[in-house]
A protein has these predicted regions:
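Redox- and metal-dependent alpha/beta enzyme cores, enriched for Fe-S-associated oxidoreductases
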Residues: 1-22, 35-40
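Extended, charge-rich low-complexity interaction segments
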Residues: 53-72, 108-126, 208, 296
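Short beta->alpha junction loops
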Residues: 28-33, 86-90
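Short helix-loop-beta junction
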Residues: 12-26, 77, 166-172
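Flexible inter-domain linker/hinge segments
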Residues: 92-145, 324-343
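Active-site cofactor/cluster-binding pocket
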Residues: 34-39, 47-50, 54-65, 142-152, ...
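Conserved thiamine diphosphate
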Residues: 73-92, 261-263
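Short, surface-exposed amphipathic charged segments that create phosphate/polyanion-binding patches used
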Residues: 42-45, 96-106, 280-285
């Protein structure tokens, strides 16, 4: 039983577990006050033996969180006596993924389930966290999932918002974007999580397994595990000034090994050089965006190039033909200078 932001993720997880034979369900609370005991009891089948109530709050000094206490009260006035436990999710703005929800059901199925637990954070002080199986990922096989690593001010986030707009305006596909920033005003880490699908998207969380990963600042290869969330056989695009021979010298061995072990298709493009030569300065976004459309095949390549150039005309037409031409050249150069690297 839950309400609010986590219910779409819970529903998605319940449907996946049901496909695999698990007998689990969800009650979404849409109207909290006045709380309707009658409607709650009618919504829960008589055969239910165990219930986990998830609240997105921590009520200090209380015997439990608000929704949990209301559910307890509802059943105390009835002749039904299921085991009811409480949990918290989404605290500290932490993501709640399907793997977290599965851990709630796994805990509920135990002989002595943990009560007043927490999901989404690692609680090493009071040890209320549940064990999470990170290998549990939901993929319908039709959604293209993309992660873009960027640097604040390099245009990556703006380009990704534009990609969403291009696909939304020109196709029947559904598009979703989540953007994550660090605390710096500029030149800080940015991460863009994009999903594209022919079906409505109900994944209200960051991508845990991507089909495509792009990294704009080459320095990140030594700072982050860039392909940790890239699926087996996925595509990795690196914007770099290094030649193919120099890559082995600069990219850490663990990253190269991960690329090889997961059979990742590795591509590079010197977006910085292209942007400088066409007159765009440090703004590499158009080059990376073009490379994304070519490699991901979210759209047919010819259509993607046409839509990109149409969006350039629409966005920069008022600034003069020179600006439009620079961006169009960046698109053309990107399609010519993509390079596949064998690891």
């Amino acid at each position: 039983i839950a309400m609010g932001s986590g219910t779409d993720t819970i529903q998605q997880t319940v449907e996946e577990l049901n496909k695999n034979g698990r007998k689990v369900g969800l009650v979404k609370v849409h109207l909290y006050r006045p709380f309707s005991t009658k409607h709650l009891l009618e919504a829960i089948p008589e055969t239910v033996e165990r219930i986990a109530v998830l609240d997105r709050t921590k009520e200090k000094g209380s015997a439990g969180e608000p929704l949990y206490l209301d559910v307890l009260e509802a059943f105390s006035d009835s002749d039904r006596n299921p085991k009811i436990i409480a949990g918290r999710y989404g605290l500290g703005q932490k993501d709640t993924r399907p793997a977290h929800i599965k851990s709630v059901f796994d805990n509920l199925a135990k002989d002595n389930p943990k009560n007043h637990f927490t999901v989404g954070i690692i609680d090493d002080v009071t040890n209320t966290s549940l064990e999470v199986d990170d290998s549990f990922v939901i993929n319908d096989g039709q959604t293209t999932r993309c992660i873009f690593w960027g640097n604040g001010g390099d245009g990556t986030v703006g380009a990704n918002k534009n990609a969403i707009k291009i696909i939304g305006d020109n196709t029947d596909m559904f598009a979703q974007g989540y953007f994550d920033y660090d605390a710096k005003k500029s030149n800080g880490l940015t991460m863009s999580h994009l999903r594209f699908s022919p079906n409505p998207i109900h994944a209200a969380y960051f991508i845990d397994e991507a089909d495509f990963v792009s990294c704009s600042p080459q320095a990140y290869v030594r700072q982050y595990d860039l392909v940790k969330n890239l699926k087996e056989g996925g595509i990795f695009l690196l914007n770099t000034i290094w030649s193919e021979e120099e890559l082995e010298e600069h990219i850490p061995n663990y990253l190269l090994k991960e690329i090889a072990d997961k059979n990742i298709k590795f591509y590079t493009v010197n977006a910085s050089k292209i942007a400088q030569e066409v007159g765009l300065g440090h703004r590499t976004n158009m080059v990376i965006q073009t490379a994304f459309f070519i490699l991901s095949e979210v759209l047919p390549i010819d259509d993607a190039i046409k839509y990109l150039k149409d969006s350039i005309e629409k966005s920069y037409g008022m600034k003069g033909q020179d600006i439009v031409d620079m961006n169009n050249k960046a698109v053309d150069r990107a399609s010519e200078e993509l390079q596949e690297i064998k690891v």
